[in-house]
């Protein structure tokens, strides 16, 4: 048998009881707990010495939520930090607000990853060791106005001394709409419109169709069932760590494939990360490389359009030119009075929009420890982001009143990159019960962005002179027509 003795603030002791009649137990202070160190700005500080507002989240807390987004993993973990997703689409953007909305920039906090400014979206949440959130003005005192909305400091997992260790995990999540709206079926729709015309517009020819209770197609379409589905997300993650007394490394790769709850919505994400740390004599070397590729398709219809279309409209109609039901039909030669709605299934089929993004972040740093109390660090960081948006719309009809007469193509490209050079000299020394920390440094940041866009529509304008006046008309045309 073994007795375990523990107390808050002390290291637990395990004592075998076999053959012992008298026990003398001395508990030692748990210095790791009492002197917990948090990352603050360009250095570290004991939590007990902190005077500003700071909150910490460890990796085990982040991993309790099944997500590929490090910011979404923060949701509900810290008081005063609001994490909102822009919509229910797979790959929807996420905003983080610390202590409400501010007036600087886009209200997003500044992200510092392993001591370097970067984009948290390039980090797989399974690669994170801890996150520190600086909420008050102390953050701006270190980073300046760019930290006016707060600072999130991310520390990723380091390599460990020893033989190569490989870990792998995978999980799958299933998403569905919590509750669908109770919409009118075909019979209810006919009755409500009959009442509407009975009260206000008996004179309209389309009124007779509803009055007689005629359903011109026999359709009873539940557009929610047609356009909503069960979403499935699959995630895979592999990590390799190892190293020696001098150098340590960590290499990881993550893949996520999500099919959204809306028809036509999907999101694929690949993350790769390499982190190196080395120590020799008075020199500490660190380097990191993060790479992310995303591909997404977003629905080409709105929820409003989906909920507005009549249940009398069939999804497919072989009598229509493009094979989809339209809100433009007649009964016995009398046009029915339908709202002008789009067939969202036709929009989903004939429109295609793909987004592709490439993120890369690289950093390298060298720290020289001249004395136990004096260190100097120089570093370089590169952040690059390439974004491509491609849209194609065929010639088709989803709304008889607004047909797409000509094919249309659009492409947008953006390439953003920034570079940061930093030099920091830090003095940190204890004098008895007192300690002094001083820092001096400089930071140079350069940023560039290139944008381009092009659009082509399958038509051309022809001009003619009629009765001495200039007239114009649009006709179908190819890319190589004069």
Model-inferred region functions:
Residues 1-273, 277-280, 284-290, 361, ...:
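Short, small/polar-rich motifs associated with maturation and membrane association
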Residues 48, 161-220, 260-267, 271-359, ...:
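Surface-exposed loop/interface segments of Gram-negative outer-membrane beta-barrel transport/assembly proteins
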Residues 81, 370-373, 431, 447:
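Short secondary-structure junctions and interdomain/linker hinges
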Residues 109-110, 311, 370, 394:
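Proline-rich low-complexity regions
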Residues 240, 367-372:
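Long hydrophobic segments that form regular secondary structure
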């Amino acid at each position: 048998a073994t007795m375990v003795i523990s107390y808050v603030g002390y290291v637990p002791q395990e004592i075998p009881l076999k053959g012992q009649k008298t026990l003398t137990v001395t508990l030692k202070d748990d210095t790791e707990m009492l002197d917990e160190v948090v990352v603050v700005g360009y250095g570290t500080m004991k939590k007990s010495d902190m005077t500003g507002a700071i909150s910490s989240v460890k990796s085990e807390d982040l991993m309790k939520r099944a997500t590929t987004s490090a910011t979404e993993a923060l949701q509900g973990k810290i008081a005063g930090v609001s994490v909102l997703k822009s919509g229910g689409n797979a790959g929807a953007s996420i905003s983080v607000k610390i202590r409400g909305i501010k007036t600087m920039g886009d209200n997003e906090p500044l992200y510092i990853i392993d001591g370097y400014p970067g984009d948290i979206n390039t980090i797989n949440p399974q690669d994170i060791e801890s996150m520190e959130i600086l909420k008050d003005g102390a953050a701006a005192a270190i980073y300046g106005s760019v930290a006016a909305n707060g600072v999130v400091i991310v520390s990723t997992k380091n390599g460990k001394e020893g033989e190569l260790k490989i870990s792998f995990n995978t999980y799958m999540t299933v998403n569905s709409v919590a509750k669908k709206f109770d919409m009118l079926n075909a019979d209810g729709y006919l009755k409500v419109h009959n009442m509407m015309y009975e009260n206000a517009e008996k004179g309209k020819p389309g009124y007779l169709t509803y009055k007689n209770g005629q359903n011109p197609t026999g359709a009873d379409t539940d557009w929610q069932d047609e356009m909503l589905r069960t979403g499935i997300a699959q995630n895979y993650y592999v990590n390799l760590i190892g190293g020696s007394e001098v150098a340590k490394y960590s290499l990881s790769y993550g893949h996520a494939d999500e099919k959204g709850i809306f028809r036509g919505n999907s999101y694929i994400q690949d993350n790769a990360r390499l982190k190196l740390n080395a120590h020799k004599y008075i020199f500490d070397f660190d380097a990191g490389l993060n790479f992310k590729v995303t591909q997404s398709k977003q629905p080409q219809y709105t929820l409003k359009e989906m909920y507005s279309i009549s249940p009398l409209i069939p999804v497919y109609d072989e009598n229509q030119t493009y094979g989809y039901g339209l809100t433009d039909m007649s009964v016995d030669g009398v046009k029915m009075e339908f709202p002008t709605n789009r067939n969202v299934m036709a929009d989903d089929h004939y429109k295609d929009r793909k987004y592709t993004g490439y993120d890369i972040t690289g950093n390298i740093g060298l720290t020289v420890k001249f004395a136990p109390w004096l260190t100097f660090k120089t570093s370089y960081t590169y952040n690059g982001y390439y974004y491509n948006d491609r849209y194609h719309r065929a010639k088709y009809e989803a709304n008889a009143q607004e047909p797409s007469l000509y094919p249309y193509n659009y492409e947008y490209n953006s390439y953003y990159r920034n570079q940061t050079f930093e030099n920091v000299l830090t003095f940190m020394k204890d004098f008895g019960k007192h300690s002094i920390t001083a820092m001096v440094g400089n930071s140079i940041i350069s940023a560039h962005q290139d944008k381009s866009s092009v659009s082509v529509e399958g038509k051309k304008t022809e001009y003619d002179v009629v009765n001495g006046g200039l007239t114009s008309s649009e006709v179908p045309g190819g890319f190589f027509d004069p």
